[in-house]
Structure formats: structure tokens, C-alpha cells
């Protein structure tokens, strides 16, 4: 395990998942503070960075405006926006940013330009893991089973009915670039399709229409870099039609998390193997949660998606799956810091010259 470090935790962000990010960061900052010195950095809804008081707490507002220079020569320091003076010197950056401008490769690209160590996947893996259309194309290229789907761009809106005639009912209509089930609808009738398509296009210029499966929702937590490990599977038993935003985050939700999932040993092994294949297919690093669908009649496993920055509250599926394996929350966070440093050192060893 790494020695005590100064870790900048970025949270909030310019996305529909801003509040979820704040919740995750509250748990992450508290857990990291057991071993490390933590600098909470709020990314507000306009994209401004606000350095908050060091310690185990976070706030959804307030802080000193700061910025990071995208050059290795500046050594990853945080500077005051007001006068450019150095205010903090993080050793590692830990993005706990869900959705666009945080989980989609943009912030990871900034970290890579700045030459700083950071937790999680790099720019390309994050971008693929965020965009459901690109993600599904990558999965198909390595032979991973998926539900049938079609991708529509905003100018193809009128093709939605034709797509559903091919896929059959029910269908899921999803924004291509958003998580936490924001903007997703399950549609069973033709008269409800336009409303679902309009909602999805409010969040993205590209949407995915996917055939609905009668399936159990199985999740796998993956940890590692070049030799990733898979947790035992967990199962989501939602309290409504599907695992939507309210099922995930509402205090009134009665959604059940089964850890471990009640599966036969061959099913457990199959889920773990698929989880690792998915992680490696997008070239992920550090950690991810892989969501699978298991057909209730045949038991066949289908890949739903990979989440390269999964929810990280103390009751979220990712930490709970590793907790069931004996890796407690604080230890898990320190392991992620170690993996981020490991990836950084590997990348620093690569040549950047031609001759």
C-alpha cells in the first residue's frame, strides 16, 4: 500500500449526475481521509473548480476558485484563479465525476496533458465507456453477446418507429452519453415512443434504442490494471419496471441488492469471465462496474454496459461487492490510489520521441 499522499478529489461536474457525484464524493473523501490528506475540489455546474477546506467533508457549493495547468512542467499543482499563485500540491487526482465532462474522457485528457497521476481509466477507455453507441460497437467486435439495438442521431428521429418494428416490444430508449438511468425510458406501446425519444434527445444528440429482455440484472466489480480481478456477482432486484434513477437513489426505494447473487457456480464463473473481457475490451484501468443481463429462461448472459466511474457511496454496489470479498471501503480506496500510481509510472516509461 502506498505511503500517505495528498489526494485531490474532484466531484460535482457539468452533468445531469451532479448530485450523485456529490454523494459519492462525500463517502470517498471520508474514506480516503483515514490514510491520506484529502483536498476536495468541487466542479460547479458551469465547470469552475472550487478548492474546499481539506478534511473528511465536502459541500455542494463554495470554495476557492482554482485551475490546473495542462502541462507537465507545472507538476500538477493547483493554482488560484485570482492571481495564479500555487495553493495546493496534490500527489494524485481522484475524479469522482459521473456523466459528461467527467466520466467521458475529457477530465482524463486534462490529467494526461498535465502529466499527473490519477485514479481510473485513461482518456480513450473513459470515452468509450461513456458512449453507449461506441461501447456496443467495441463489445460486438470482440464477440460479446448483447441485446439487439440501433443508434439514432438527432436528425434521424423520424426513424424511431421503423427501428422498433425491427426490434419488437418492449424497448429501452437511452441517451448515448449519460448514466444513472437519467433520460432512460422503458416503452411498451407505440403511443409512448415519441415521448421517450424526445426525453432521450433532451440529454444527448445521439440515442440508443435497445430490445428489452426478460432478464435478471447482474453486476460485477472489476479491480486492477493489466491483470484485472472480478468480484463475486451481485444482483439488482428493482422495485419497479427497471432499475431507474429513483430505484437507485430515492430514500423510498425498496430495490434489493443481493450480494452475492444467487447463481450456480458455472454462472458465477461465466459472469466473472465476461466482466474481465468487457474491462479489457475497452482497455479500462483501475476499476469499473460491469452490468450484465441474464436471460430468465435460458440463463444466457448479455452485456449491458461498463461504468468506468461507478457510484461510490458506502452503500453502492461496487464497494459492497468488494466488501463481501473482505476488502473494506478504506482499503479499497487506497488500492485504487496504488493502481493509479502504477498506471502513471508505466506511461512515463513510454517513449515520446521518434529516433
Predicted regions and their residues:
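ATP-dependent carboxylate activation and anion-phosphoryl transfer catalytic cores
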Residues: 2-5, 11-14, 141-143, 264-355
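ATP-binding N-terminal substructure of ATP-dependent carboxylate-amine bond-forming enzymes
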Residues: 1-124, 128-130, 134, 141, ...
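Phosphate-binding site of ATP-dependent enzymes
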Residues: 188-273, 296, 300-302
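A glycine- and small-aliphatic-rich helix-loop capping segment at beta-alpha/alpha-beta transitions
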Residues: 109-118, 189, 194, 324-327
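Conserved hydrophobic "DFG−1" position in protein kinase catalytic cores
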Residues: 80, 222, 292-294
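Active-site nucleotide/adenylate-binding loops and adjacent lid/helix of ATP-dependent enzymes
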Residues: 2-11, 15-16, 23, 84-87, ...
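Hydrophobic beta-strand scaffold residues
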Residues: 38, 117-118, 146, 171, ...
Amino acid at each position: 500500500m502506498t505511503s500517505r499522499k495528498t489526494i485531490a478529489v474532484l466531484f460535482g461536474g457539468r452533468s445531469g449526475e451532479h448530485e450523485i457525484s456529490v454523494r459519492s464524493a462525500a463517502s470517498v473523501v471520508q474514506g480516503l481521509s483515514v490514510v491520506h490528506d484529502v483536498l476536495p475540489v468541487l466542479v460547479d455546474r458551469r465547470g469552475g473548480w472550487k478548492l474546499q477546506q481539506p478534511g473528511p467533508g465536502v459541500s455542494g457549493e463554495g470554495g476557492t476558485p482554482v485551475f490546473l495547468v495542462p502541462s507537465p512542467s507545472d507538476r500538477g499543482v493547483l493554482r488560484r484563479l485570482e492571481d495564479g499563485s500555487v495553493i495546493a500540491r496534490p500527489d494524485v487526482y481522484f475524479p469522482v465525476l459521473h456523466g459528461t465532462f467527467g466520466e467521458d474522457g475529457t477530465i482524463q485528457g486534462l490529467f494526461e496533458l498535465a502529466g499527473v497521476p490519477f485514479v481510473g481509466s485513461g482518456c480513450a477507455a473513459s470515452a468509450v465507456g461513456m458512449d453507449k453507441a461506441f461501447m456496443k460497437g467495441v463489445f460486438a467486435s470482440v464477440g460479446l453477446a448483447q441485446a439487439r439495438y440501433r443508434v439514432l442521431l438527432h436528425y434521424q428521429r423520424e426513424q424511431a418507429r421503423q427501428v422498433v418494428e425491427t426490434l419488437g416490444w418492449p424497448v429501452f430508449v437511452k441517451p448515448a452519453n449519460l448514466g444513472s438511468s437519467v433520460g432512460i425510458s422503458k416503452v411498451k406501446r407505440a403511443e409512448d415512443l415519441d415521448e421517450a425519444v424526445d426525453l432521450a434527445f433532451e440529454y444527448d444528440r445521439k440515442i440508443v434504442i435497445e430490445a428489452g429482455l426478460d432478464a435478471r440484472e447482474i453486476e460485477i466489480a472489476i479491480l486492477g490494471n493489466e491483470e484485472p480481478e472480478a468480484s463475486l456477482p451481485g444482483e439488482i432486484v428493482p422495485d419497479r419496471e427497471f432499475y431507474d434513477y429513483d430505484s437507485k437513489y430515492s430514500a423510498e426505494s425498496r430495490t434489493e441488492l443481493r450480494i452475492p447473487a444467487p447463481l450456480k457456480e458455472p454462472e458465477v464463473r461465466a459472469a466473472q469471465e465476461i466482466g474481465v473481457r468487457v474491462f479489457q475490451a475497452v482497455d479500462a484501468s483501475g476499476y469499473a462496474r460491469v452490468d450484465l443481463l441474464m436471460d430468465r429462461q435460458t440463463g444466457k448472459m448479455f452485456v449491458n454496459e461498463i461504468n468506468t466511474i461507478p457510484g461510490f457511496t458506502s452503500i453502492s454496489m461496487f464497494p459492497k461487492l468488494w466488501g463481501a470479498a473482505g476488502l473494506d471501503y478504506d482499503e479499497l480506496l487506497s488500492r485504487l490510489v496504488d493502481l493509479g500510481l502504477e498506471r502513471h509510472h508505466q506511461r512515463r516509461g513510454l517513449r515520446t520521441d521518434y529516433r
